[in-house]
């Protein structure tokens, strides 16, 4: 990969207020304030190793939505060749998505079936869900703001993608990505 190529990891997730990913011990019975209203945000994100990461919200996860996410990512990383690692969700394989990618200097690299753990962005989703679970979410806007703030903070950490780069890229490309 050249310096003109940006490596990214795409995935979608729907953090919601009713998920319980937060655990705690309490001997004094600390009161827990929890919002029981179900609010969810269908979130798409691309974690960029050496470019600009994005997170956006869509109503659905259809092929048109995936194309729009790719379009937004291309705008965030103009005049770059994009390599995007993604899972085998049916909308990711749609002709509309593949045609858009082919016409805009985007290479889609699909993970093997049933291997979501190979996508480093999954760990970011786990951390975001934990944060949402521990936060009293007032409304849709508060949920989306919480997700964006967490994603922006977490996307800047190399620990999410560093091992993937070392394990799956050739050494000369890995050293370029890691700035060595």
How should each PLM-predicted stretch be described?
Residues 69-72, 96-100:
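A short acidic, amphipathic alpha-helical/loop segment
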């Amino acid at each position: 990969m050249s310096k003109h190529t940006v490596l990214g990891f795409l995935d979608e997730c729907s953090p919601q207020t009713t998920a319980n990913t937060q655990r705690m011990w309490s001997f004094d019975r600390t009161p827990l304030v929890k919002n029981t209203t179900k609010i969810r945000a269908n979130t798409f994100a691309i974690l960029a190793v050496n470019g600009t990461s994005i997170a956006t919200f869509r109503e659905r996860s259809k092929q048109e939505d995936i194309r729009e996410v790719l379009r937004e990512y291309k705008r965030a990383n103009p005049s770059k060749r994009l390599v995007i690692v993604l899972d085998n969700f049916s909308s990711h394989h749609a002709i509309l998505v593949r045609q858009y990618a082919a016409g805009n200097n985007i290479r889609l690299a699909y993970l093997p079936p049933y291997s979501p753990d190979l996508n480093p962005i999954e760990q970011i989703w786990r951390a975001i869900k934990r944060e949402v679970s521990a936060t009293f979410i007032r409304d849709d806007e508060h949920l989306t703001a919480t997700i964006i703030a967490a994603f922006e903070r977490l996307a800047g950490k190399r620990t999410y993608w560093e091992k993937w780069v070392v394990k799956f890229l050739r050494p000369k490309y890995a050293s370029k990505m890691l700035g060595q």
